[in-house]
């Protein structure tokens, strides 16, 4: 399991409302699936575990397997490569990896806060590196975007 050391400021804010711990006690995070045209078989399970880890470590919510007061689920919908910095010999010296995750957030206590939204992050890396060497950073960025997102603004 990857230890996720986020650099983002966690605000626990979804759709304009902070978590009310007097009403919301539990969260269910369903396994994210990989629906991208290109599939890295380890990415979805790792993303799910990293997301669970953040909630366990940085909220007072109890993680439960089903019927949580809050529920997160979704799928990886994009895992895309693009050549960057093409050299004179027509070989790219850098590659851009973009990961997109669609997330559905449900609040059983306050359904007005429910939303579905896609989050993306990309990183350029030297073409001699493996994509897995930047995946962790991209997943961390997407998790930070999810936390700090105010879906009402989108």
Locations of the language-model features?
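Sec-dependent bacterial lipoprotein signal peptides
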Residues: 1-6
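Generic detector of isolated residues embedded in canonical secondary-structure elements
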Residues: 7, 28, 54, 73, ...
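Aromatic side chains
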Residues: 12-14, 32, 55, 79, ...
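Short, exposed beta-strand "edge-strand" segments with a Pro/Gly-rich flavor and a Y/T-containing core
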Residues: 15-17, 126, 152
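Surface-exposed short loop/turn segments
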Residues: 57-59, 69-114, 118, 122-137
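Conserved small/polar residues in nucleotide/adenosyl-binding loops
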Residues: 147-154
């Amino acid at each position: 399991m990857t230890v996720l050391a986020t650099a983002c400021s966690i605000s626990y804010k979804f759709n304009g409302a902070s978590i009310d711990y007097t009403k919301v006690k539990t969260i269910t995070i369903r396994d994210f699936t990989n629906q991208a045209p290109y599939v890295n078989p380890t990415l979805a399970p790792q993303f799910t575990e990293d997301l669970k880890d953040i909630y366990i470590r940085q909220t007072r919510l109890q993680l439960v397997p089903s019927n949580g007061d809050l529920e997160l689920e979704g799928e990886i919908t994009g895992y895309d490569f693009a050549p960057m910095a093409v050299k004179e010999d027509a070989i790219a010296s850098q590659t851009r990896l973009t990961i997109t995750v669609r997330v559905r957030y449900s609040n059983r206590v306050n359904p007005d806060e429910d939303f579905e939204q896609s989050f993306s992050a990309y990183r350029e890396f030297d073409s001699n590196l493996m994509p897995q060497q930047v995946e962790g950073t991209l997943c961390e960025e997407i998790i930070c975007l999810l936390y700090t997102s105010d879906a009402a603004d989108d």
